[in-house]
């Protein structure tokens, strides 16, 4: 028997810059997580938990009470300087996100990690711009053709 994977820990380690968890029965919360992920410039991932109708027959039948424990929302730091704020979750800390990911299933819901940094597209754009400046805006096609001529 092996230890099950922890997708949230893997996401923190992978370098995703927005990581959140929500539940399919909490539509307002899920919508807010999707909104924040869409507005985040960079790689965003949301883990959406849901009752499984395969292993839990009747999970979505009308009037059937939901199972699976509490829906505990992460209390995010607001940086207002109050002592209470220091006890809250810092979404910019990978260490804090890793600790949240360690909480027993189903854990807490909300934003685990959010860090602003240049996206892949921004980094590529800057690389292309810098390269063009270094080559005095030379025609890329001509440079490639010249390079291949030298290989014949």
Task: Say what each PLM segment does.
Residues 25, 51-52:
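Conserved beta-strand edge residues that scaffold enzyme active sites
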Residues 31-32, 40, 51:
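Hydrophobic pocket-lining "lid/loop/helix" segments that shape and contact the acyl-thioester
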Residues 39-41, 105-106:
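Short, well-ordered loop/turn elements at secondary-structure boundaries
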Residues 19-22, 45-49:
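Short, conserved beta-strand edge motifs with alternating hydrophobic and charged residues
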Residues 1-36:
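Conserved thiamine diphosphate
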């Amino acid at each position: 028997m092996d230890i099950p994977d922890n997708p949230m820990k893997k996401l923190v380690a992978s370098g995703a810059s927005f990581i959140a968890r929500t539940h399919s029965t909490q539509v307002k919360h899920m919508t807010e997580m999707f909104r924040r992920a869409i507005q985040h410039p960079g790689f965003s991932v949301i883990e959406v938990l849901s009752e499984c109708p395969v292993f839990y027959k009747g999970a979505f039948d009308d009037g059937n009470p939901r199972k699976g424990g509490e829906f505990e929302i992460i209390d995010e730091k607001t940086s207002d300087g109050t002592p209470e704020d220091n006890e809250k979750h810092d979404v910019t800390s990978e260490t804090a996100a890793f600790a949240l990911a360690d909480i027993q299933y189903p854990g807490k819901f909300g934003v685990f990690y959010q860090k602003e940094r240049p996206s892949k597209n921004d980094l590529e754009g800057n690389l292309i711009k810098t390269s063009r400046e270094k080559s005095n805006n030379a025609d890329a096609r001509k440079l490639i053709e010249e390079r291949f001529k030298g290989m014949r």
